[in-house]
Amino acid sequence: MAFLASGAYLTHRQKVLRLYKRALRHLESWCVQRDKYRYFACLMRARFEEHKNEKDMVRATQLLKEAEEEFWYRQHPQPYIFPDSPGGTSYERYDCYKVPEWCLDDWHPSEKAMYPDYFAKREQWKKLQRESWEREVKQLQEETPPGGPLTEALPPARKEGDLPPLWWYIVTRPRERPM
């Protein structure tokens, strides 16, 4: 999985926290009854708390490695995956039913009055988008070589120091490749 490749860039604390959360999720798959799960979750928390203030980083790293190995051997063979999570049965299933943003333009003023904060921020966003559109298209045309690709492989529509365009995720790719 792509998100596991970034483990080298995590701090020790982040690695421990992620291990703890994964362990709790797998424990939830093992213990169906909530009271039983809560009891074992408290025991697991106590085991993590024992070494919370470990000052020796070599020892802390060794403890983390041992905990990762123990997790590997005790993990559930079919952990519960929430339906809307990546790998779940409904992940990205209902994206086609999401209402597009432009449909909110057709709301009656009395309907918009029920959500004044949202529509005030939305109007600011639309104004900013209209103001920056020409500048961003010009920048995109400057960065695209003549006869270059006109598909998804467009250059990034962002120069160093500029704010990211409000629409760049639709028509361009990010400047750096994600790791």
Curated annotation (Swiss-Prot):
Keywords: Acetylation, Electron transport, Membrane, Mitochondrion, Mitochondrion inner membrane, Phosphoprotein, Respiratory chain, Transport. The modification N-acetylalanine is found at residue 2. It is a peripheral membrane protein. Pfam families: Complex1_LYR. It is found in: Mitochondrion inner membrane. GO terms for biological process: mitochondrial electron transport, NADH to ubiquinone. Residues 136-162 are annotated as: Disordered. The keyword Electron transport applies. The modification Phosphoserine is found at residue 85. One of its GO terms (cellular component) is respiratory chain complex I. InterPro entries: Complex1_LYR_dom, Complex1_LYR_NDUFB9_LYRM3, NDUFB9. Mammalian complex I is composed of 45 different subunits. Belongs to the complex I LYR family. Accessory subunit of the mitochondrial membrane respiratory chain NADH dehydrogenase (Complex I), that is believed to be not involved in catalysis. Complex I functions in the transfer of electrons from NADH to the respiratory chain. The immediate electron acceptor for the enzyme is believed to be ubiquinone. PANTHER family: NADH DEHYDROGENASE [UBIQUINONE] 1 BETA SUBCOMPLEX SUBUNIT 9 (PTHR12868:SF1), NADH-UBIQUINONE OXIDOREDUCTASE B22 SUBUNIT (PTHR12868). This is NADH dehydrogenase [ubiquinone] 1 beta subcomplex subunit 9.
